[in-house]
Amino acid sequence: MLADDKLRARRELPAAYRPADSATIRARVGGQIDVGVHSATHRSLPTLTDEELEREVVTSRAMLHRAVGIWPEFFAYPYGHWDPRVRAFVLSAGYRAGLTLDAGLNDAPDDLWCLRRVNISAAISDAAFQAWAVGLQGWRRD
């Protein structure tokens, strides 16, 4: 019954708010968007066994490849949770980089499998974003 309610709710969403299907993603890859992996089930990766971690990091990449025809190059850690073991799985799976939720900027010598990010709110105005993008809001590295 809950599954039926979820399907009905999904159909009632405006098309722009529905998850993209494989055909839509395939049509956009390469031109408008890059596709990365965020795991198979969005679990906190450091808490998983090696077998579970394999599915979340490695198998999910292969599944996405089969669905949309590209090998994703970037992995975003669910909840930003990672540790050296998780980082090693992401590296050995063939990703070019791993993205954390650690706030900040990155420099050339930084570890590509634990990159920091800058969170931009969806509510930011165009003018505020443009000011931020040209450096009018200073960022400090701690």
Where are these regions (language model features)?
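Active-site beta->alpha N-cap acidic-glycine motif
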Residues: 1-32
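C-terminal active-site subregion of NodB/CE4 polysaccharide deacetylases
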Residues: 30, 40-43, 47-142
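Non-cysteine beta-strand/loop elements that form the S-adenosyl-L-methionine
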Residues: 35-37
